[in-house]
Amino acid sequence: MSSRVLTPDVVGIDALVHDHQTVLAKAEGGVVAVFANNAPAFYAITPARLAELLALEEKLARPGSDVALDDQLYQEPQTAPVAVPMGKFAMYPDWQPDADFIRLAALWGVALREPVTAEELASFIAYWQAEGKVFHHVQWQQKLARSLQIGRASNGGLPKRDVNTVSEPDSQIPPGFRG
C-alpha cells in the first residue's frame, strides 16, 4: 500500500507517546508524521501550526473580491419528475422509461448494451404521438425495447452511415477481372 507523507519529520508512535513535547518542539514545520507498524498512522501538530492553518483556511474561504454572483446562474433548474399516468395513456412529450429500463428489457428478452439515447427516445415518442395509440406504461417500455433492438440491429450493430459523406471508391480489382 503506497502512501504520501506530507512532512519530512517522521517519528514512531512509541517515541511520540514517550515524550511528545520534545518531538513536536524539534519538528521543522510544527508537524510530525507518526508511524505505527511501519505505516503512517496520523499527524501530530503543534497548537501554533494549527492556528496558522486554520487562519489560512479561513482566509481562503472568503471571496477574493466583493463582487458576488447570483447562485441561480450556476444551478441547473431541477425539473420535477413527471408522474406516470395510471392505466392506459397516449404517448406524451415528457414520457420517460423507468430508471432500470435496461434491466427490464433484459427480462423481456431484449439485451441492450447501452441506455436509450435522447435521439432514439425522441424518435420513438414522435412516432407514437402521431399514431395516437394508448398503452400501459410497461407496454410502452416494451415497445421502446423492441424498437431499440430492431433499430440497432438493422445495420449489423454498426452506427448508421452519414448520408452527407462522400464515398471513396477502392482501387482493388476483384479476382477474375482484368485491370
Curated annotation (Swiss-Prot):
Instruction: Please verify whether the record's keywords include Transferase.
Output: no
Q: Where is this region: Disordered?
A: 156-179
GO CC terms: primosome complex
Alphabetically list the UniProt keywords.
DNA replication, DNA-binding, Primosome
Q: Superkingdom of this entry's organism?
A: Bacteria
Biological process terms in GO annotation: DNA replication, synthesis of primer
**Does the record bear DNA-binding in its keywords?**
yes
Q: How does it assemble?
A: Homooligomerizes. Interacts with PriB. Component of the replication restart primosome. Primosome assembly occurs via a 'hand-off' mechanism. PriA binds to replication forks, subsequently PriB then DnaT bind; DnaT then displaces ssDNA to generate the helicase loading substrate.
Q: Which NCBIfam families match?
A: PRK02854.1 (NF002770)
- Which protein family is it in? Belongs to the DnaT family.
Q: What does this protein do?
A: Involved in the restart of stalled replication forks, which reloads the replicative helicase on sites other than the origin of replication. Can function in multiple replication restart pathways. Displaces ssDNA from a PriB-ssDNA complex. Probably forms a spiral filament on ssDNA.
The name under which this protein is listed is Replication restart protein DnaT
The species this protein was found in: Escherichia coli O7:K1 (strain IAI39 / ExPEC)
According to the entry, what is the taxonomic lineage of the organism? Bacteria, Pseudomonadati, Pseudomonadota, Gammaproteobacteria, Enterobacterales
Q: Its encoding gene is what? A: dnaT
